[in-house]
Curated annotation (Swiss-Prot):
It comes from Vibrio campbellii (strain ATCC BAA-1116). O-methyltransferase that catalyzes the 2 O-methylation steps in the ubiquinone biosynthetic pathway. GO terms for biological process: methylation. This is Ubiquinone biosynthesis O-methyltransferase. It is an enzyme of class 2 (transferase). Pathway: Cofactor biosynthesis; ubiquinone biosynthesis.
Length: 235
């Protein structure tokens, strides 16, 4: 597989079609807005803040996490292959008066030219949308500086995650559009650790992300059966 091939055109098309609603707090991306404070605080805590640090957000989409890190004083670059989401991200940042840079590129191409550039790399809800997640993880490892931090989040692959993320979230509760996820592309934590072990990253911790349908809220916890976040550092 060449670098240019680690993109699923159907995945890009899917998010291109929803791009104009990226910042609609009650739209298809409502869950991302709901979990963003949790993701942001986790990154801030584990990376000892991001103020003044160079941060790369891989698969940034419309810029929800990227913009929030920029507001914390980070020098942020958002990377995505979707043209429409990036245009939405740039416009929203302009309207919000937030300074950051957005680039349309694969992470593999970006890593080839920017190795060892970033203090922090985030790759949230992205690995399950690409053909070769190991290639993305290797590129993240290449992009971060020694002693820097890399964060990955994705979904576990088991019957519970199928019932919660596919049947529940897509088909019954309609929290996200049907077809957003492919359960076969979900990644078990053991598979994630095996891929991380093939790089010069060291796993520092893993936490679960839990949804409560009774009060429509999320929280972090130890159970990683469905959504989870992994914190790594480069040695």
């Amino acid at each position: 597989m060449t670098k240019a091939q680690n993109v699923d055109p159907s995945e890009i098309k899917k998010f291109e079609e929803m791009a104009s609603r990226w910042w609609d707090l009650e739209g298809e991306f409502k869950p991302l807005h709901q979990i963003n404070p949790l993701r942001l605080n986790y990154v801030l805590e584990k990376a000892d803040g991001v103020f003044g640090k160079k941060v790369l957000d891989v698969g940034c989409g419309g810029g929800i996490l990227a913009e929030s890190m920029a507001k914390e004083g980070a020098v942020v670059t958002g990377l995505d292959m979707g043209k429409e989401p990036l245009e939405v991200a740039r416009l929203h940042a302009l309207e919000a008066g937030t300074k950051l840079t957005y680039i349309q590129s694969t992470i593999e191409d970006h890593a080839a030219e920017n190795a060892g550039t970033y203090d922090v790399v985030t790759c949230m809800e992205m690995l399950e949308h690409v053909p070769d997640p190991l290639s993305v993880i290797r590129s993240c490892a290449a992009l971060v500086k020694p002693s820097g931090h890399v964060f990955f989040s994705t979904l576990n692959r088991n019957m519970k995650s199928y019932l919660f993320a596919i049947v529940g979230a897509e088909k019954l509760l309609r929290i996200v559009p049907e077809g957003t996820h492919d359960h076969e592309k979900f990644i078990k934590p053991a598979e994630m650790m095996k891929m991380i072990d093939q790089t010069d990253l060291t796993e520092m911790g893993i936490t679960g992300l839990h949804y409560n349908p009774l009060n429509d809220s999320y929280k972090l916890g130890r159970n990683v059966d469905v959504n989870y976040i992994v914190h790594t550092t480069k040695y």
